């Protein structure tokens, strides 16, 4: 029986089977029709954490790796594909966490649903998003922040992109993006935002199986794949390779003000970059909704990076960094070093 037939019948794949299937997909061994059928069948069946881990194994076998010499390393990423067009808080949060002393390996791509994805805004800010692995390694080691542009570090994905574009639906690859950081072997902490509440436990289980030391999988209940100041947030905790807790966190619970969705709306890359400089450089007050949402996500990064022992302490440290303009200094160094 073919893998496609098994998936259609509702059978789950084990880790090795999922790895082998992904290697065949990204290795160009299957036709576009076969790949499309498998992607649609998987989505209809639903994924398991074990399947996700196997798919990660397969993708990483074909990835270009980055191996920075740091003791701890964090990634802040979302799946994209959320329901609201918010500004890119996770990217600014990564720069803020780096300014607070936690190295960040940011893995991202261009926009999925908003006007401005992580690659779009960093490019508009002057970062060379096409930097090679050695340059990214230096950025992480010397500045504390490096960006890995997904198409450059996962070149085999070119075999899948035409099918994904033609399908025009979310597939397992939307979920795999945050789990396939090219520096994965060095990543000790991760904040992953998901586009659906149904993905929380699934992704947390995969993150635990992949052995992350500390992780948070988050979903803003108004449909945001980041920690949001506009609503309650569902948060699943991963600690030492185990899913340990699940909680609902409102902005007010961690000392932040609730905002209206329009106050954290996204914009085109040029406008977003201009605003990002103000946020990172301390030009906006600490009670500004976008400053607070950046601090919310940066606080989570500091928590998973083991720089603080609570989300609240991480948020306060992030607010201090932003008020002092130190995150903008990190950005400027990354721009210089990546060019």
From Swiss-Prot:
Positions contributing to anthranilate 1 binding: 78, 109
Cofactor binding notes: Binds 2 magnesium ions per monomer.
Pathway: Amino-acid biosynthesis; L-tryptophan biosynthesis; L-tryptophan from chorismate: step 2/5
GO terms for cellular component: cytosol
Catalytic activity: N-(5-phospho-beta-D-ribosyl)anthranilate + diphosphate = 5-phospho-alpha-D-ribose 1-diphosphate + anthranilate
Family assignment from sequence similarity: Belongs to the anthranilate phosphoribosyltransferase family.
Designated name of the protein: Anthranilate phosphoribosyltransferase
Native species: Methanopyrus kandleri (strain AV19 / DSM 6324 / JCM 9639 / NBRC 100938)
